[in-house]
C-alpha cells in the first residue's frame, strides 16, 4: 500500500508541474496564436471558430503575397475571380450613374422661339396700317372685339354660306332672370345659415330674394294671385 501511495503522489506532482510549465512546443506548434507559427499567418480568420482551417468562401488562389500577376482560373472558387473584365457594379451605383448616361436627365439648353434661321422676313415687312384680310395675318394690334378671333376659323373662312339667312325669329334673351329660381323655403326646409335677414336662423317673413321680380312679372300678366 505504501508503494502504491508513493507512486500516485509522484504521478500527481508530475502532472501539476506539467500544467504549470505547459507544453514545450507552444511557440512552434502549428495553428498557434503567436506570430512565430509557420502554419497560419495572423490574418482575418484568426480568433474565429475553426480558424486553423482554410475558408471555403475564399478563392483557392487568393494569396496576397503571391508573385504571380495572372490568376489561375482552374483553382478559383468563383469564375469571376481572376478575369480581366471590369468590376461588378452595385444596383445603387448603376442607378446613380444614369445621370451621366441617360440623355433624358441631362440639363437641356433653352433656345429662343425666333432666331436668324426661323425668323420670316414677311412679318417685319408687313405694313401695320393695312387692314387685316383674315385669320392668317399676324395682328399688330388687338382687335376692337376681343372675342372675334375665337369665332374666326378655317371652316368659316373657306366655306362661306351661299345665301344670307335671316336671323332667328326668337332671339335669345340676354337678361338673366331669377323669377323661376327655387329659393330655400323658410318653413319646410331645415334651418341653416344660408338665409336673408337679421336673424338668419328664424326668418319667417315669407319674403325671398326673387319676390320683387315675381311681382313685376305677374303684374304684367294680370294674375290676381302673386306667388311668393
From Swiss-Prot:
Residue spans, topological domain Cytoplasmic: 140-228
Region (Mn): 152-162
Location of the region described as Disordered in the Swiss-Prot/TrEMBL record: 123-147
Keywords: Cell membrane, Cell projection, Cilium, Cytoplasm, Cytoskeleton, Flagellum, Membrane, Transmembrane, Transmembrane helix
Expression sites (tissue/organ): Highly expressed in the testis. Weakly or not expressed in embryonic stem cells.
Extracellular side, ranges: 1-122
Membrane topology annotation: Single-pass membrane protein
One GO BP: flagellated sperm motility
Keyword Transmembrane helix (UniProt): yes
Subunit structure and binding partners: Microtubule inner protein component of sperm flagellar doublet microtubules. Interacts with MYH9. Interacts with MYH10.
Official protein name in the record: Cilia- and flagella-associated protein 95
Upper taxonomic lineage: Eukaryota, Metazoa, Chordata, Craniata, Vertebrata
Encoding gene per record: Cfap95
